[in-house]
């Protein structure tokens, strides 16, 4: 199978996962990041800062729209150079609260789904996956770099 096709299929699949995760948060008026952040095991002080009443609405907004826009970007193949790195950062921010450092999780989850997503998103940026059947490719063919 062709490398470009694999990048395209993987980009759209990961995009769908991110879009779905964002939309389910957007349409649920009761959704909040508070439960996830409040249970942070690593860097608890950092994550508890996001729980402050004046900051939590912004945290929720950034989660909902960050995932939704990341999904749209990946599916459309638009701005992948940037959204891949920003998405990887978001995945790392999701990773640390569940990590009970220096202990490894019950099922050896030192590497969990967030790390895999982060690595895949970085690969999308490095290999400019949006240039393959995406708006980045269209923009490049029409306007150059």
Predicted regions and their residues:
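Extended, low-polarity transmembrane helix blocks
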Residues: 1-38, 42-69, 76-145
């Amino acid at each position: 199978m062709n490398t470009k096709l694999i990048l395209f299929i993987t980009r759209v699949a990961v995009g769908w996962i991110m879009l779905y995760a964002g939309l389910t948060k957007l349409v649920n008026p009761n959704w909040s990041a508070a439960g996830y952040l409040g249970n942070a095991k690593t860097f608890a002080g950092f994550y508890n800062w996001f729980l402050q009443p004046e900051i939590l609405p912004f945290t929720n907004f950034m989660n909902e729209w960050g995932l939704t826009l990341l999904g749209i970007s990946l599916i459309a193949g638009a701005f992948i150079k940037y959204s891949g790195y920003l998405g990887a950062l978001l995945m790392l921010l999701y990773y640390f609260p569940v990590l009970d450092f220096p202990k490894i999780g019950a099922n050896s989850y030192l590497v969990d789904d967030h790390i895999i997503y982060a690595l895949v998103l970085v690969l999308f940026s490095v290999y400019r996956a949006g240039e393959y059947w995406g708006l980045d490719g269209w923009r490049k063919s029409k306007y150059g770099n």
